[in-house]
A protein has these predicted regions:
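Beta-strand-rich domains and repeat architectures in extracellular enzymes and scaffolds
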Residues: 114-117, 121-155, 396
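Short loop/turn segments immediately following the C-termini of beta-strands
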Residues: 149, 194-196, 242-244, 284-286, ...
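Beta-rich, blade/repeat-based domains predominating
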Residues: 126-141, 149, 171-194, 218-237, ...
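Short loop/turn segments that connect beta-strands within beta-propeller blades
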Residues: 158-162, 206-210, 251-255, 293-298, ...
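Asp-box/WD-like beta-propeller blade repeats and closely related beta-sheet repeat scaffolds
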Residues: 111, 115-120, 199-236, 240
Length: 406
């Protein structure tokens, strides 16, 4: 996940980071923590393919430090790149909203990037307290799976829009459930779970919801947080660890985790995608997307090119040489489709398919069903602190929408 301001100390308040750069109105960071975050962010300048993403992160940190001049100055540089960052949609900038300079910047962004809507309603839950994070599709059974952070369960959704528990809340005493994917080989279901005290598990269920295994990293004294994952045909799983800024490969036969070495340090890794031929895995973090060659083990950052950003992708998916991203870490959320070059290392075309519409309330992830992309419209993760609902009166039925991939 990713939202409620990029900050929340992606280094120091892991669950908040996981739940996205705009996710939770949780604990207020002190100046010492924010200064540490600022220093860490500055180290990424010149080290990534997307300068705008680093600038947006720094501007938000300055805003939280109540340094309006530095925040606006940094935002001006970011907005001038015309990549799509929209500070109006990020709570970190709440203290600047009465500033004329800030208003001028957001007006410019909205002129450059007008609202777009191509989606239509798909499903609506009757249950209000789900607060979902992950969505997956099982083509063999023609069923969707929705993970619940608050109720700590997994729900199955039929094509008719019928919701039923796949793994009930009290069955296995699960942690909050995040990313979820289906193993196409045997229709089993894998999911990531994570509580903000640093407890995290990789879960494996059969296609009837029976728990086949739950796996944790060896104790190392650090806080970890599994977030999203992909499943290879051989049964191995790649999973992002948002809290500790790493990616792991879980070897299913040996039941062992192996850390993946990447070309640069990560900042809250989140969404992850697997190419159809399983030649590459794409890892999203707050600053962009890295491609990992599964044969050589080498990695490199995907270059978005000018006037484009791959940053802040909570959900990331591969479809016909394209990446589909649910970007809720760039201010106002959007869903975008990125056509890639033959080597998978450059964006050749960007198509924003949903932005500043009634379907981008607070999206987190989605799932592909053929050429249609289904996604969570209103996750409500901003009403959750850890596994506690902040205001029960604000809970709403979960809306899921769909759109056709261009």
């Amino acid at each position: 996940m990713t939202r409620n301001s990029i900050r929340f100390l992606l280094f120091l308040i892991p669950f908040c980071a996981a739940l996205s750069t705009r996710a939770l109105p949780q604990e207020i960071a002190n100046d010492e923590e924010l200064q540490a975050q600022l220093a860490a962010g500055k180290k990424f300048l010149g080290q990534t393919a997307d300068r705008g993403a680093v600038l947006f992160f720094l501007a938000a940190t300055y805003a939280q430090l109540k340094e309006p001049h530095e925040a606006v100055t940094t935002l001006k540089e970011c907005v001038a790149l015309k990549e799509g960052f929209d500070p109006a949609g990020d709570p970190a900038f709440a203290g600047l909203r009465q500033s004329k300079d800030f208003q001028t910047l957001t007006e410019q962004v909205h002129r450059d990037f007008p609202p777009i809507s191509t989606a239509q309603p798909a499903f609506l839950s009757s249950e209000k307290g789900l607060i979902p994070e992950g969505l997956a599709y099982d083509a063999a059974q023609d069923v969707f799976y929705l993970s619940s952070l608050h109720l700590k369960k997994i729900v199955a959704i039929s094509r008719l829009g019928e919701f039923a528990d796949f793994v009930s809340a009290d069955r296995y005493k699960l942690l909050p459930v995040l990313g979820i994917r289906v193993d196409a080989y045997d229709d089993s279901v894998w999911s990531a779970s994570w509580l903000d005290n640093g407890r995290t598990e990789l879960l494996h269920f059969d296609n009837r919801g029976k728990l086949l295994g739950r796996f944790s990293l060896p104790e190392d004294g650090r806080k970890h947080g599994f977030n999203d994952l992909v499943v290879l045909r051989a049964g191995d799983v790649f999973v992002t660890d948002t809290a500790d800024n790493h990616v792991y490969r879980f070897e299913a036969k040996a039941q062992a985790f192996h850390e993946i070495k990447l070309a640069r340090a990560l900042l809250a890794p989140n969404g992850i995608a697997l190419s159809d031929d399983e030649s590459a895995v794409y890892v999203a973090d707050q600053l962009g997307v890295l491609r990992v060659d599964l044969k050589s083990g080498q990695s490199a950052e995907v270059n978005p090119g000018p006037h484009c950003t791959l940053a802040g992708a909570d959900g990331l998916y591969w479809h016909a040489e394209k990446l589909i991203a649910v970007q809720n870490g760039i201010g106002s959320p959007r869903i975008a489709v990125f056509q890639l070059s033959g080597d998978g290392l450059h964006v050749t075309k960007t198509t924003v398919v949903e932005y500043r519409s009634k379907f981008t309330v607070l999206p987190t992830t989605g799932a592909l069903a053929g050429d249609d992309f289904y996604f969570i419209v209103n996750s409500q993760i901003d009403n959750l602190n850890g596994d506690r609902v902040l205001d029960n009166t604000k809970l709403q039925p979960v809306r899921i929408a769909k759109l056709r991939i261009p």
